[in-house]
Amino acid sequence: MSDQKKEEEEEAAAAAAMATEGGKTSEPENNNKKPKTSGSQDSQPSPLALLAATCSKIGTPGENQATGQQQIIIDPSQGLVQLQNQPQQLELVTTQLAGNAWQLVASTPPASKENNVSQPASSSSSSSSSNNGSASPTKTKSGNSSTPGQFQVIQVQNPSGSVQYQVIPQLQTVEGQQIQINPTSSSSLQDLQGQIQLISAGNNQAILTAANRTASGNILAQNLANQTVPVQIRPGVSIPLQLQTLPGTQAQVVTTLPINIGGVTLALPVINNVAAGGGTGQVGQPAATADSGTSNGNQLVSTPTNTTTSASTMPESPSSSTTCTTTASTSLTSSDTLVSSADTGQYASTSASSSERTIEESQTPAATESEAQSSSQLQPNGMQNAQDQSNSLQQVQIVGQPILQQIQIQQPQQQIIQAIPPQSFQLQSGQTIQTIQQQPLQNVQLQAVNPTQVLIRAPTLTPSGQISWQTVQVQNIQSLSNLQVQNAGLSQQLTITPVSSSGGTTLAQIAPVAVAGAPITLNTAQLASVPNLQTVSVANLGAAGVQVQGVPVTITSVAGQQQGQDGVKVQQATIAPVTVAVGGIANATIGAVSPDQLTQVHLQQGQQTSDQEVQPGKRLRRVACSCPNCREGEGRGSNEPGKKKQHICHIEGCGKVYGKTSHLRAHLRWHTGERPFICNWMFCGKRFTRSDELQRHRRTHTGEKRFECPECSKRFMRSDHLSKHVKTHQNKKGGGTALAIVTSGELDSSVTEVLGSPRIVTVAAISQDSNPATPNVSTNMEEF
């Protein structure tokens, strides 16, 4: 220790003498001194000696070109950074600089003159330049020694006055091949592809060998950008450097592979497998600053967990388990430093699928205020591992060869629905029904198969998929020669029941036709051999005395069936039979039938059957409701001839009174919302409750004005408009002309309650002449 102290004192004295001489060359005997390692600096030199040595280096930039080269050793086991031929320790710590700046802190700054990397703290460099306006030339310090593992330190002084250092590593292989990394040329390392290998030396160091030694793996250095990292070197206290300990939680990273299929991008997870069993790897990356996405250089440290076997991830040794940790590099530049901490074994940086992990290094000269950034990305299999923005250790499981999952994507095809031909449908009860295309039933030939009952059912398939039946039921008919039903597109039921004859008159009870919609016209029917019923000639109805009176109509369905068309469920209802009186018929034959002689039965929805008793030979009347006023006093021969009949609306809360049944029926349709009168004008289709409303509406289409003013010959569509117009003439003349409007019926106060049948309106214009007792009266008759 005393010899070392003496040497340090001599170096300090020599530095002071050099400072007094004004920057002369240093003593050449210090150039051949051996480099010293860490751990033996116990005494600190005086600040005066340090200042003298620093000033001598600033004053003589070109005199130390022949000094010994600096070799920096990074010891991961102790966490120290050393200069090999200088008795000091360097430490890499972060500073509060703009960007990703690092500084080197010298723990024991020596006083010798060959310390080429020692600078006072006042001249430390950063990424942000000071405001000095002096422009000085760039100063460069480099060494020419070929010692393996050395670094070349280049001092760069910016025009602003700040000092920066570029540290260029000089690598040498085992065979003595020199590898020079030039930061100014990004294409100089393109030829190094596949020529650098990392071999564990067993002493916590790495040896770079040529690719022709083994066939393990390759370390690629590609895409070097022109970037430099400002390095600040100042004396300080040695603090052990933590290389692999990073605070924060561990985040799981899942590697996915984007695949574009048919315009759709899918992210498929990559499953890694080794031939006979693989090892897990851990890749840790330091957190990047908010300004950049990467850190200032990465260090790939291989730490095999199983040191008894080979640490290669090749399929030849499937039992190996390797942990790969990428932490922040402690090198002086942004170039990647590769250190293997394996005691035994060999690390190959290629995966089992022969896909190479590419380490991209980038360096740019720091000449502006922009941040110096180094883009170093570890790309296994062409995929990038996204870096977390927090100080967390990202853990990636790397297990052998990636195997892509096979995903089969089938293009969607449009469903083609074809028309289903008539086929059999299996019902729950086991019966099979053959569907038949829906078509009008034109002609049905019926023959007597049962003397008591004949039931004919024709199935049709509705558009909604349901099967409806057209039914014609004939009871108590012994023989039936021919029956034609035309335009019967809906389900219907016809029942003919013969009754006994009395007094030479045969009565037949006919059940009404049950439909679910439009009117049905029954044209002709041939009935023969019916008991107590003679042949009916439709052409001779007038002479035969056949009278078809009011037939009550209801909506019903065939027994055992329910029709669900349009969401309406129809239930079977009880129908009172209608009596048709037939008299004076003696073997009439069927002849020509004219349209005005056909018996037509119009069926309308909304009409209900009253519960009146049907008696043969009595005239039936249609009633709107079952109130006592509607049922009592029917006909003109009532008990009180002078009493006016009143028809009261039975709807709760209404109570309106009408003198005629037609008025009450129209009023009830207004309650139920039924509008059976539809305008058939093109593109109109409006519906009305009463027929007179429809007629009045049609005049708006035709433009017909039926009502003319007797004074000015103006014409109006409605009579109430004419009445208002006549009053204007009366007011102008001051009562000189009196108009009397007399109707043939009683008018209601409401316009909407006008009678549905035409009325005779008499308009009498009375004018005065010289003799007021004999006025002239002109009468105009208008029908509307």
UniProtKB/Swiss-Prot annotation:
It comes from the Eukaryota. A motif (9aaTAD) lies at residues 467-475. Keywords: Activator, DNA-binding, Metal-binding, Nucleus, Phosphoprotein, Repeat, Transcription, Transcription regulation, Zinc, Zinc-finger. One of its GO terms (cellular component) is chromatin. A zinc finger (C2H2-type) spans 647-671, 677-701, 707-729. Its main location: nucleus. One of its GO terms (biological process) is regulation of transcription by RNA polymerase II. Pfam families: zf-C2H2. PROSITE patterns: ZINC_FINGER_C2H2_1, ZINC_FINGER_C2H2_2. Residues 121-136, 302-344, 364-380 have a biased composition (Low complexity). The modification Phosphoserine is found at residue 46. It is found in: Nucleus. The keyword tRNA processing does not apply. Binds to GT and GC boxes promoters elements. Probable transcriptional activator. Belongs to the Sp1 C2H2-type zinc-finger protein family. This is Transcription factor Sp4. It comes from Homo sapiens.
